[in-house]
């Protein structure tokens, strides 16, 4: 049976384009109010950046970043069915420069490799791991923090369950802002100089 769930890009050059959403049994789509908050907060940072969406799902955040003139957008997704939706979404939006890249695999393995390929670029990481209350995902935030401690990026945004208290510092990153939206919170980190 074909999944008919969709979401819409609401700004930039892809405005009004629809993306297919993977099954809600395997992913949790970012709420519109949360997405809008991220892009309002990062408005001055997106242009010309490399935007990497960890735990990519439909690729909505990476696609919205490229829609708002990020140089390149990556989305990493492990679940095969979700990745198929992601790849289809990006193939409908991509231009000849292949500005959107869908990657099937483990976020914890692929993120350092993508960053290594874009070492000279301004990079923004957007992490939306499955909330740790889901089966098989306890400890996901600690695992994410451990990976981030070893990485170089300019900005990191983590979407997490509001009951989780985010770390003030993660390696070279310092928390500079949090915004709560009911059960979801966005925590913003910047690279300490």
Task: Report residues per predicted region.
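Core SAM-dependent methyltransferase catalytic element
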Residues: 177-193
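Mobile, glycine- and charge-enriched loop segments
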Residues: 42-52, 107, 111, 115-127
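Conserved SAM-binding motif I beta-strand of class I
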Residues: 72-77
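S-adenosylmethionine
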Residues: 114, 118-174, 180
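S-adenosyl-L-methionine
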Residues: 1-68, 84-121
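Short, glycine/acidic-enriched loop or turn micro-motifs at the edges of active sites
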Residues: 56, 80, 109, 131, ...
């Amino acid at each position: 049976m074909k999944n008919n769930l969709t979401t819409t890009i609401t700004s930039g050059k892809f405005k009004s384009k629809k993306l297919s959403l993977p099954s809600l049994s395997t992913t949790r789509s970012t709420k519109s109010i949360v997405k809008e908050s991220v892009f309002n907060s990062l408005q001055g940072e997106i242009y010309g950046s490399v935007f990497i969406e960890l735990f990519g799902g439909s690729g909505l955040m990476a696609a919205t970043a490229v829609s708002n003139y990020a140089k390149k957008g990556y989305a990493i997704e492990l679940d095969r069915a979700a990745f198929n939706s992601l790849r289809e979404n990006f193939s409908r939006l991509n231009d000849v420069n292949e500005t959107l890249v869908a990657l099937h695999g483990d976020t914890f393995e692929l993120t350092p490799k993508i960053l290594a390929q874009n070492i000279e670029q301004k990079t923004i990481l957007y992490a939306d791991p499955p909330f740790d209350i889901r089966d098989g995902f306890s400890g996901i935030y600690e695992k994410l923090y451990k990976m981030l401690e070893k990485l170089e990026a300019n900005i990191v945004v983590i979407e997490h369950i509001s009951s989780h208290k985010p770390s003030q510092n993660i390696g070279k990153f310092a928390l500079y802002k949090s915004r709560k939206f009911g059960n979801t919170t966005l925590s913003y980190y910047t690279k300490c100089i």
